[in-house]
Amino acid sequence: MRASQWFLVTQKETPNDAEIASHQLMLRSGMIRKLGSGLYTWMPLGLRVLRKVENIVREEMNKTHAMELLMPSVQPAELWQETGRWETFGGQLLTMKDSNQREYCFGPTHEEVITDIMRNELQSYKQLPVNFYQIQTKFRDEIRPRFGVMRAREFIMKDAYSFHLSLESLQETYKDMYQAYCRIFDRMGLKYRAVEADTGAIGGSASHEFQVLAESGEDLIFYSDASDYAANIEQATSLKPPKANQACNETITLVDTPNQKTIDEVASFLGIASNQTIKTLIVKGKEHPMVALVLRGDDELNEVKATKHPLVHSPLSFIDEELILKTLKTPLGSIGPIQLNIPVIVDHHALAMPSFVCGANQADKHFINAAWERDAKYDDAYDLRNVKEGDQSPDGRGTLHCCRGIEVGHVFQLGDKYAKAMNASVINEQGQLQTMIMGCYGLGITRVVAAAIEQHHDEHGIIWPQALAPFQVNIIPLNGARSQTVKEQAESLYQQLKSHGIDVLLDDRNERAGVLFADNDLIGIPHRLVVSERNLEQGCIEYKSRTSSETQLINLDKVVNFIIELINK
C-alpha cells in the first residue's frame, strides 16, 4: 500500500476525553473516529487490524470444526420472553418496536436465537454434537460507555454455541474451545491468563475468562505462584483455614463503645486490630426476610459468592437501617451474631477466630472475648470473602498474587438453561425426547484490539505484535521526490516484499523525515526500512525495529531475506 493513496490521518495532540492509552492512540493514529456515545467508526487503518483479528479467530474456530453462520442482530422479543431474560437482562437491552408495534431488541448476545434455530433443525441424537459460531455486531446499552472501544455500546464479537446430549460431550467441546482460545491469543502475541470465573447473567455450571494482563485492566485476577490456579476476584478462593483449635479462656464481657459505628472506629476505640473484630451484615433472604452474613472485620464481602448461598436472595439486597432498627431493635453499628434471631452464615476465616469483638445488639455496646459455639451460634459456614494477596492458594500450592486484566474472552458450560426454557429436544438412542445441553464461547473482537494496545505501547505510540500490525513493514524513502535513485530503490524493495506476501506500506508522502518517523512509531509498524542516498552509496538500507531505539545497516542484496526471516521467527 502506498501512503500517498491511503487515508492516513494522524494527530499530535491527545483528545481530552480519552482516558486510557488504547483510546488515545486509536484516535491519534486514525484507527477509529467517534460517532456518538459508545459508537465508533473503524477507519481503514483500524479495520486492517480488526480483519487480522477476525482471520486468526476464524482460522482457529474452523480447526475445531465449528461451523460459521450469521444470525440477525435484531431479535424478536418472544424469544427473550421464553427464557425470561426480556425482563431480567436489565437496562443494557436496547428494545424497539416495528411499524406493526411488534417488539424487538438489538442483540447483546444470541443464546435465544441459536437455540430457536437448533430446536427446529435438530431432531436426532445422530446430528449431535454440533458447534456453530458467528462474528457479528452486538449492542449493549451501557449507561456510561468509556475507554473507547474497550467498553463501547456497539461492538463486534465472535460467539459460538455447541449442542450436546451428554455432559462428557459438552466437556470435550469445552476443552477444544478452551485450547482454541489459547492458540488464538498465543498467535496474537498477547500475555494472558485463563481464570475461573462466575457465570453471571449468561448462566451455566462452569466458566473461564481469558484476561489480557494490563495495568489499566478493570478486573482483578488472583493466581498462585506455585501452581496453575487462577481466578477473577468474583470467583477466587483461598485455602480454607481450620477452626480455632483451642477454646477461649477469657470471659465474654460487655463494653461501652459510644458513637463507634464502623469496624475501624470500634477497633481504634478498643485499641485492637480490625482483624480481631467481626462484622455482621444484614441482607434479604430467600426463605427468611433477613439473613446475617458474618465476616472478619478486615475482610470484604464478595457479593457474587454470597448470592450463591441457598439462604441468600439474588440479586444481593442489603436491608436498610430503618427496617433493621424496627425489626431487630438494634442500630446498624452495634449488630452482632450473639442471640440474633435470624439465620447466621459465617465466613470460614471468621469461624477460625478463637475469640473476637462483635456488636452486642444494643446501642453503643460491643462484646469482647466472644467465641463461637460457647457464645455465638451459626447456621452455616461458607466462603463469603474476597481473597487477598498473600492468602494460601486453595489447592495448597503456593500463595496468591494479584494482577489486573482485561477480559477478552469467556467460555461457559451452559447446561440445559436455555434448551429447557425453549423446549429444545431431540430423540435419543432410546427413542425418547431428551433436552439438549449447551456450551457458549464468546470473544470480543473489537476489545482484543484495544487490549493489545494497552499491553503493547510506549510514549511514542503503539507497538503492534506482528500478527496484528496493520502493516508489517514500512518503507520510508527520504527525499524520494527529488532523488530518482531513492525512489526506484524504494519501489523495487516494495515490490519484492509484496511478492513474498508481506504487508508493506510505502510511505511516499512528501513530508519531513521527522514526521514520517513519528507517524511510523505512532501507528506501530514493527519493521522500518529507510532508503536514503547516503546509505545507498554504501550499498545499504537502514533498518529499525519498533521495539528498539537502535538502527542498523543491512546490505541491499540481503535486506529482503533479512525481513522475511524476522517475520517468520
UniProtKB/Swiss-Prot annotation:
It holds the Pfam family tRNA_edit. It catalyses: tRNA(Pro) + L-proline + ATP = L-prolyl-tRNA(Pro) + AMP + diphosphate. It is found in: Cytoplasm. Signal peptide: none annotated. InterPro entries: aa-tRNA-synt_IIb, aa-tRNA-synth_II, aa-tRNA-synth_II/BPL/LPL, Anticodon-bd, Anticodon-bd_dom_sf, Pro-tRNA-ligase_IIa, Pro-tRNA-synth_IIa_bac-type, Pro-tRNA-Synthase_IIa_type1. One of its GO terms (biological process) is prolyl-tRNA aminoacylation. The keyword Cytoplasm applies. One of its GO terms (cellular component) is cytosol. One of its GO terms (molecular function) is aminoacyl-tRNA deacylase activity. Belongs to the class-II aminoacyl-tRNA synthetase family. ProS type 1 subfamily. Homodimer. NCBIfam families: PRK09194.1 (NF006625), proS_fam_II (TIGR00409). This is Proline--tRNA ligase. It comes from Legionella pneumophila (strain Paris).
